[in-house]
Amino acid sequence: MVKIELDINGISFFVNTTWKTDTVPAVGDIVIVDKESISQFDRVELRKTPSNQAFRWADEEDNAPVLEHFDFDTEMVVKKRTWKFDSEDEEMVCILKVAFLCFEE
């Protein structure tokens, strides 16, 4: 299991996934976040969307606070990927620093 910490504008979100470490999002990958399923407090599962090779956040419960700057499907790009060691759980944590993608209409 890989622990992932998503850094969005300095706010950390924690994610569990069963993927191997080399399959976590890389720099330049697109991360798609549904505002109904993002939370600072709940662990959510990172799922891969096969059709476009993007990544979607999905939560089983709808008790997460909604962040105002998220839209229905907010796209973000991974700007930096680093690793740290979690001494409490004795495993590596992948930290993804992401930035919002803005499209002008």
Q: Which ranges hold each PLM region?
A:
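Short solvent-exposed strand/turn elements
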Residues: 79-80, 87-105
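Short, compositionally biased
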Residues: 41-87
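Short, well-ordered loop/turn sites that connect or cap secondary structure elements
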Residues: 22-29
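Short, surface-exposed secondary-structure boundary micro-motifs
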Residues: 36-37
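Short, basic/aromatic beta-hairpin or loop at an interaction surface
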Residues: 1-13
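Hydrophobic residues positioned within well-ordered beta-strands of beta-sheet architectures
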Residues: 4, 74, 94-96
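Short alpha-helix capping/helix-loop boundary micro-motifs
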Residues: 13-21
